[in-house]
Amino acid sequence: MKKLQKYLMILGTIMLSSGISACSKQPDFDVKSYVQSSLDAYYHGEYKDYANLLEISEKDAKKEIEEDFNESIQQQFDDSDNITDKGIADYTEKLTEVKKLAKYKVQDVKEEDGGYTVSVQVEPSNVFQTLQQSSTEVSNEKIKQGLDGNDPEVFASVLTESVQKSLEKNSYGKTVTVKVSVEKDNSGKYGLSDTEMSKLEAAMFPTE
């Protein structure tokens, strides 16, 4: 089950490939709406406001975020023959459920040094903190059933069932406030960088 531990360890990093696009160059750029709609689109699958800000269709916004997310997961298995395509698809579906656990509230915005600092109130989920225990429980169940953990279908079921078990016992910790920067990129558009998204991700889904 060493391979299983490897994928569980990188679970928290998979979701950091945000695919959040930079937004307006305009002076009337609504930072709060941008951050709120970006998080709503990425975590909760609510694309309308995000699409409006980017001036694209909801369909394109959904495609952009889902493709980036799916690709980030697929890359983790590129060097593995230990899981089927269906297994990866099932696993991706479970991680989409994990994303929906995200609890956040965009609060104050301060303009600083040509960019913006945004305060986001976050309730930490313990879904990744319980994953190790969940995987141990599921693995032991499979062993008792006489199943081979190296079998691709068994391996996939252990991954998805481990995530499901942690989803079912999810709880939230004390609210924390995270400050993120919204800055201009090379094209002059404002956006949340992967580094800033990582700050939020680490607060919403701590692994330790």
Which ranges hold each PLM region?
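Core segments of small alpha/beta cavity-forming domains
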Residues: 24-97, 105
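Short amphipathic beta-strand and strand-loop transition segments with alternating hydrophobic
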Residues: 100-111
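Mixed-charge, low-complexity intrinsically disordered segments
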Residues: 69, 128-173
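C-terminal motif of bacterial Sec signal peptides marking the signal peptidase cleavage site
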Residues: 18-22
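Short beta-strand edge/turn micro-motifs at domain boundaries
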Residues: 140-154, 170-208
